[in-house]
Amino acid sequence: MRQITVFIVDDNKELRNALEEIVSMSEGYHCIGTASSAEEAVDRIPIVRPDVVLMDINLGTEESGIDVVKVLKPRIPDTNFMICTVYEEDEKIFEALSAGASGYILKKTPPGRMLEAIRELYEGGAPMSSQIARKVV
C-alpha cells in the first residue's frame, strides 16, 4: 500500500512535533514536512505536493491557515487540506470549507481518529469531528 504523504502547518512547535511524530510512527503515513507560518507553508507545500495538509487556523500572524488554503488549493488542486484547530465556531468552519478545505477536525481529536481522518480525506471523503459535523448537517 502506498504511503499517504502529510504536511503539517502549526505555529505551536510542541503540537507540530507531536503531530509529526504521530504521523511518522504510523504505518501507511509519511510526514514530508512541517511549517510554522503561513509564508513558510505557501513557499514549501507546492514544492513537496503532499497528499494531505493538516492546517491550523491561527498561525500567530495576520495570515491564517484559511488564507493559506485559499492561495494554495487552486495551485495544487490534488492536495487535500484538512483544518486541525481548536475553533468550533460556525463562521470559521464555513469559511474554511469555502476556502477549499475538505475536512475539519479539532485538535482534541484522539490520534487514532486523526489518522483515520487523514486516510478518509485521502480516499475522497470529507472527515469532520462529530462536534463539527453536527453544525454542518
What are these regions (language model features)?
Residues 51, 58-60:
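The short loop immediately C-terminal to the conserved phospho-acceptor aspartate in CheY-like receiver
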Residues 92-98, 108-137:
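Short, flexible helix-to-coil linker/hinge segments that flank and couple to helix-turn-helix
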Residues 34-52:
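Acidic, metal-coordinating helix/loop segments flanking the phosphotransfer/catalytic sites
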